[in-house]
């Protein structure tokens, strides 16, 4: 992360709005040796302030496009965590992550390098609760629909059964 950004508000929003751990929930924050640690450490502090049982794990760097097979330490940490906050990639399709998610763990994965200003503004300048309300309304609409016909002024004309 090359820009000097105060990550405190971003970390607080990430933990308080997106992750929302209850007191005692396990939160694993993962970064790697190629990334700056300021944001992951700030998120760790925010998770601890929220009362979570939070840990920060720094793993070896793997190319973002490569499939990672984490070793036993990282795999066990992933499996033991209710919330996984990944800042470096390489674990989304890992067997431990897939198993953890099938058991109910939640994964928040992002890579902010080179887009720091954008992600900071994007998270801090939105009405997240309104987005959730709108998503719930759309979900309710889809749940009560058998057939959909979508058109737009740009020429979209799609029909499908649900």
Which sequence ranges carry the predicted segments?
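Active-site bordering "gate/hinge" segments
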Residues: 1-162
